[in-house]
């Protein structure tokens, strides 16, 4: 194994460990009295049970000892994508899935995220487009999680794909929705939208020339 491969494996292990630590904190809330804490935790437990069951049913060589390796970031991402894209997913499960997605995404390899970005973006566009469509406390948390997903998706768009952000209607529409939340009456939602805009427009890779900089200035004028 060469140096590059060693670094790649090390980074993957670090991301897995970081995600496991984050999910462990959520898992402990499965018996919480607060619905917006309990629901994502219970969904996480259900997802992990499904992933473990799938791992145990995979065919193996006759003499190979069964060793079930914990699911990694990509497996969690695929499970959440499946829930978010299903037509029969309830509003509550959708909301919990978006929250878990905001936790998982930063730990998934950028190439995998880019391959799934269009579907994931569509999944979070709905709550952003209807920011008052649910119970107040649950909706606040759902919006902040959706903004976290958008930030993660924007963060991994390479500079060479500038035209994707400039031309794709879904991206433009989502950015406009984010800008609208910058003047939302709810302080936590407004603050999270401000953070997203500030972080994305100031990313060093774009050298202060992000595709949405002018659009944001025109909106603020």
What annotation goes with each model-predicted range?
Residues 1-221:
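Extended, low-complexity, acidic/polar intrinsically disordered regions
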